[in-house]
């Protein structure tokens, strides 16, 4: 059972890393030599950042299965929203509305 969980965790990490790599395609397109050079330079900077991020994703240990966060999530998943009763149809007048009506009548 733990082997399967480990394998699923590894697959999830690899999918995330693959998604990161797909978000940074190699630059293409026309332009002057300096424009192409700058695009490649910026691409290479992003590529290095993605490699560093992918390395930290891959090497970061998975949290234990029974961590307080997992227990809190399980508790929150058990919560449900109950049906609320219908609001009353006839509400008594508030004191503010009666005072304003009296002032209008006096004026």
Curated annotation (Swiss-Prot):
<keyword id="KW-1035">Host cytoplasm</keyword>
<feature type="short sequence motif" description="Nuclear export signal and binding to XPO1">
    <location>
        <begin position="71"/>
        <end position="82"/>
    </location>
</feature>
<dbReference type="Pfam" id="PF00424">
    <property type="entry name" value="REV"/>
</dbReference>
<dbReference type="GO" id="GO:0051028">
    <property type="term" value="P:mRNA transport"/>
</dbReference>
<keyword id="KW-0509">mRNA transport</keyword>
<feature type="compositionally biased region" description="Polar residues">
    <location>
        <begin position="91"/>
        <end position="107"/>
    </location>
</feature>
<keyword id="KW-1048">Host nucleus</keyword>
<dbReference type="InterPro" id="IPR000625">
    <property type="entry name" value="REV_protein"/>
</dbReference>
<dbReference type="GO" id="GO:0030430">
    <property type="term" value="C:host cell cytoplasm"/>
</dbReference>
<protein>
    <recommendedName>
        <fullName>Protein Rev</fullName>
    </recommendedName>
</protein>
<dbReference type="GO" id="GO:0003723">
    <property type="term" value="F:RNA binding"/>
</dbReference>
<dbReference type="GO" id="GO:0044196">
    <property type="term" value="C:host cell nucleolus"/>
</dbReference>
<feature type="region of interest" description="Disordered">
    <location>
        <begin position="21"/>
        <end position="42"/>
    </location>
</feature>
<comment type="function">
    <text>Escorts unspliced or incompletely spliced viral pre-mRNAs (late transcripts) out of the nucleus of infected cells. These pre-mRNAs carry a recognition sequence called Rev responsive element (RRE) located in the env gene, that is not present in fully spliced viral mRNAs (early transcripts). This function is essential since most viral proteins are translated from unspliced or partially spliced pre-mRNAs which cannot exit the nucleus by the pathway used by fully processed cellular mRNAs.</text>
</comment>
<keyword id="KW-0014">AIDS</keyword>
<comment type="subunit">
    <text>Homomultimer; when bound to the RRE. Multimeric assembly is essential for activity.</text>
</comment>
<dbReference type="GO" id="GO:0003700">
    <property type="term" value="F:DNA-binding transcription factor activity"/>
</dbReference>
<keyword id="KW-0694">RNA-binding</keyword>
<feature type="short sequence motif" description="Nuclear localization signal and RNA-binding (RRE)">
    <location>
        <begin position="35"/>
        <end position="49"/>
    </location>
</feature>
<keyword id="KW-0813">Transport</keyword>
<feature type="region of interest" description="Disordered">
    <location>
        <begin position="81"/>
        <end position="107"/>
    </location>
</feature>
<feature type="compositionally biased region" description="Polar residues">
    <location>
        <begin position="21"/>
        <end position="34"/>
    </location>
</feature>
<feature type="region of interest" description="Homomultimerization">
    <location>
        <begin position="16"/>
        <end position="24"/>
    </location>
</feature>
């Amino acid at each position: 059972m733990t082997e399967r969980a480990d394998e699923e965790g590894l697959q999830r990490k690899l999918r995330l890393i693959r998604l990161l790599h797909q978000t940074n395609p190699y630059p293409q397109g026309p332009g002057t030599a300096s424009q192409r050079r700058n695009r490649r330079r910026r691409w290479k900077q992003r590529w290095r950042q993605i490699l560093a991020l992918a390395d930290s994703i891959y090497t970061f240990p998975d949290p234990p299965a029974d961590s307080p966060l997992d227990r809190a999530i399980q508790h929150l998943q058990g919560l449900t929203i109950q049906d609320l009763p219908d609001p009353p149809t006839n509400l008594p007048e508030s004191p503010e509305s009666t005072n304003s009506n009296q002032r209008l009548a006096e004026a």
